[in-house]
Curated annotation (Swiss-Prot):
GO cellular component labels: cytosol
Cofactor(s) recorded in Swiss-Prot or TrEMBL: heme b
Domain of life: Bacteria
Name of the protein: Catalase-peroxidase
Function: Bifunctional enzyme with both catalase and broad-spectrum peroxidase activity.
Catalytic activity: H2O2 + AH2 = A + 2 H2O; 2 H2O2 = O2 + 2 H2O
PROSITE patterns in UniProt: PEROXIDASE_1 (PS00435), PEROXIDASE_2 (PS00436), PEROXIDASE_4 (PS50873)
Organism: Clostridium botulinum (strain Alaska E43 / Type E3)
Cofactor: how bound: Binds 1 heme b (iron(II)-protoporphyrin IX) group per dimer.
GO BP field: cellular response to hydrogen peroxide; hydrogen peroxide catabolic process
EC numbers on record: 1.11.1.21
Family, as annotated: Belongs to the peroxidase family. Peroxidase/catalase subfamily.
Name of the gene encoding the protein in the UniProt record: katG
Enzyme class: oxidoreductase
Length: 730
């Protein structure tokens, strides 16, 4: 009998570690806590003390750019360059890396190098981009840790544009690679590629998605669901680009500028194309879409299914795309791969496109249905014609839109690295004034804390206001947070979750403390309202801990500044408004998504782990920080006292819980013996006793010997959120 045979039956085992039916298979609606623990050090091959920003400083940036410029025309036999130039190919790679960003939740984008992993590495819209990254591998190998894949892909796109005649706006490094697929990103619910279950009856795209079909970056180039309707396509383009925070001018500039370069590939039927990288045979070594038609590359390449270039000279920045778009009438045809596209009629010789491999052959320019949307849409058309008349404006606006496209998910400009960071700041970067004054000292902090204590503001007012200011932070695109004190500005000051009337009273009191301090001290020392708001939270927590019998000091680091309304794009910040905030037991309305799932989503955006989320919920409840002073989940008889009462009473078997509403959104807890009503709760509260993982964590904080641990862990998690946007101190 061999080791891997059953001693009874003698049969070979098929099982390996991690295989078999999973908990998710048995209980598909199970709460997904895994997204709170992705990207741990256990999956990271770099050492714990690895600092990418410090490594980037060692990079010979100009030498790297020279190598990238040389690569553009260094055609390889295994994947020859169209027109002898990889530039257009690399622009597509960079665009498709950054273009997955969506403003709704800040997820996607190019900041983590996600194109290397599933599902993006195998999306139909990313066909053959695996080869682009392989072409880059020798350069990545050469420069190693000094340049991340995420930075390299975007910089390569920049170099491609520059090598073909466009002056770019610049480049900011600082994108840190991850080492595994990201489970937190909702790409849609479809089970098949190019499935379309995401548009409602009114044709509005499901939030937060920014692509019309599964596996596409934006839209179907053939038209909506493959229907060659230019106006319908323009509708899709407008909606998807808006979901990426682009306006109509930026959209036209990006489409027209991007399609100035390169060609589409549809030499033959897609049936010749093998599986995507994730499903490819092991001997292909991570490459996918093996093409058995002809040579499998060059003129025989099969990609999107469309075939041809948009204009003559596809490797030079010219006005050819817009000239061709408006100069000719277009006829609907099908490519050799069977895809709908449009060919120009009666083309002048000067506008014919030389073949990508054989210079003796020429082809008519082609357009996608989406391209024709720029010509026939009543909003896009005048914008496009204006660019046609103003080449310099077109080049400038494309460069600006490209910079925004490739940097939108990086957060504030303080995170940008390298010698090509533009001096100009942009409103979409959520600018914050630089510190130009001396910061307050420990003595000053003590003085201000006493003023806050004497102000008459309650513990819950102080803590809730600090939370409201800081908890807008999103780890996805590094937006939001307490720095800037934008809680006092539109739109945040009028968000329902912030209880505007109460917020205004608190802010006015804190503002007076700030003004009194600044007027008393010399002009070279100041304190910002942003700092005082967070310091107020520290005061509240310290007082609540003192009431529980613990003298603790909540860490505080000054250095925040106050942004102005002019520096704040109201429309852009509106997307940060919480639809639900489980930490304040707030839900704007009833949603299809369960409140506990919304809590996990928000915790992930806040970069919290499951234990951090749990301890914060327990602390916020006993500190009485619920929206509108709701008693749901306030499982304590001593509110504003920092105790572990939430966990102790949640896990008390003397309480019986019963739904209070038909939808099981709210619950009542009764004494098991007397039937007396003890507590009320929401789903967010009860999930910490219902879910086995969260209950296990809750049990830790309910233990008699962990009362102080609860306080220390709460302060640690609290401080993490208060400083989430303080990139300069990390």
């Amino acid at each position: 009998m061999t080791e891997n045979k059953c001693p009874v039956t003698g049969k070979m085992s098929k099982a390996t570690a991690g295989s078999g039916t999973t908990n998710k298979d048995w209980w598909p609606n199970q709460l997904n806590l895994n997204i709170l623990h992705q990207n741990s050090q256990l999956s990271n091959p770099m050492s714990k003390d690895f600092n990418y920003a410090e490594e980037f400083k060692k990079l010979d940036f100009q030498a790297l750019k020279v190598d990238l410029y040389m690569l553009m025309t260094d055609s390889q036999i295994w994947w020859p360059a169209d027109y002898g130039n990889y530039g257009p190919f690399f622009i597509r790679m960079a665009w498709h890396s950054a273009g997955t960003y969506r403003v709704g939740d800040g997820r996607g984008g190019g900041s983590f190098g996600l194109q290397r992993f599933a599902p993006l590495n195998s999306w139909p819209d990313n066909i053959n981009l695996d080869k682009a990254r392989r072409l880059l591998w020798p350069i990545k190998k050469k420069y190693g840790n000094k340049i991340s894949w995420a930075d390299l892909m975007i910089l390569t796109g920049n170099c491609a544009l520059e090598s073909m005649g466009l002056k770019t706006l610049g480049f900011g490094g600082g994108r840190v690679d991850v080492w595994e697929p990201q489970e937190d990103i909702y790409w849609g619910s479809e089970k098949e590629w190019l499935g379309d279950e995401r548009e409602k009856d009114d044709e509005e795209l499901e939030n937060p998605l920014a692509a019309v079909q599964m596996g596409l970056i934006y839209v179907n180039p053939e038209g909506p669901n493959g229907n060659p309707d230019p106006l319908g396509s323009a509708h899709d383009v407008r909606e998807t680009f808006a979901r990426m925070a682009m306006n109509d001018e930026e959209t036209v500039a990006l489409v027209a500028g991007g399609h100035t370069f390169g060609k589409c590939h549809g030499a033959a039927s897609p049936s010749y194309v093998g599986p995507a990288p994730e499903a490819a045979p092991i001997e292909e070594q991570g490459l996918g879409w093996k093409n058995t038609y002809g040579s499998g590359n060059g003129d025989d390449t099969i990609g999107s299914g469309l075939e041809g270039a948009w204009k003559a000279n596809p490797t030079k920045w010219t006005m050819g795309y817009l000239k061709t778009l408006f100069k000719y009438d277009w006829e609907l045809v099908k490519s050799p791969a069977g895809a709908y596209q449009w060919l120009a009629k009666n083309v002048d010789e000067e506008d014919m496109v030389i073949d990508a491999e054989d210079s003796t052959k020429k082809h008519r320019p082609m357009m996608t249905t989406a391209d024709l949307g720029l010509r026939y849409d009543p909003i896009y058309e005048p914008i496009a014609r204006n660019y046609l008349k103003n080449p310099e404006k077109f080049a400038h606006d494309f460069a600006a839109a490209w910079f925004k496209l490739t940097h939108r998910d990086m957060g504030p400009i303080s995170r940008y690295l390298g010698p090509e960071v533009p001096k100009e700041s942009f409103i979409w970067q959520d600018p914050i004034p630089l510190v130009k004054h001396k910061l307050i000292t420990k003595k000053d902090i003590t003085h201000i804390k006493k003023k806050i204590l004497d102000s008459g503001l309650s513990i819950s007012d102080l803590v809730a206001t600090a939370w409201a200011s800081a908890s807008t932070f999103r780890g996805s695109d590094k937006r939001g947070g307490a720095n800037g004190a934008r809680i006092r500005l539109e739109p945040q000051k009028n968000w329902e979750v912030n209880e505007p009337k109460k917020l205004n009273n608190v802010l006015n009191t804190l503002k007076q403390i700030k003004e009194n301090f600044n007027s008393y001290h010399s002009k070279d020392k100041k304190v910002s309202l942003a700092d005082i708001i967070i310091l107020g939270g520290c005061v509240g927590i310290e007082q609540a801990a003192k009431r529980a019998g613990y003298n603790i000091n909540v860490p505080f680091i000054p250095g925040r500044t106050d942004a102005t309304q002019k520096q704040t794009d109201v429309k852009s910040f509106a997307v940060l408004e919480p639809k639900g905030d489980g930490f304040r037991n707030y839900l704007k309305t009833k949603y299809v998504v369960k409140p506990e799932d919304m809590l996990i989503d928000r915790a992930q955006l806040l970069t919290l782990t499951a234990p951090e989320m749990t301890v914060l919920i327990g602390g916020m409840r006993v500190l009485n920080c619920n929206y509108n002073k709701s008693k749901d989940g306030v499982f304590t008889n001593r509110p504003e006292c920092l105790t572990n009462d939430f966990f102790v009473n949640l896990l008390d078997m003397n309480t019986v819980w019963k739904p209070k509403s038909e939808g099981k959104d709210r619950f009542e807890g009764f004494d098991r013996e007397t039937g007396e009503l003890k507590w009320t709760a929401t789903r967010v509260d009860l999930i910490f006793g219902s879910n086995s993982q969260l209950r296990a964590i809750a049990e830790v904080y309910a233990c008699d010997d962990n009362k102080e641990k609860f306080i220390q862990d709460f302060i640690f998690a609290w401080n993490k959120i208060m400083n989430a946007d303080r990139f300069e101190i990390k």
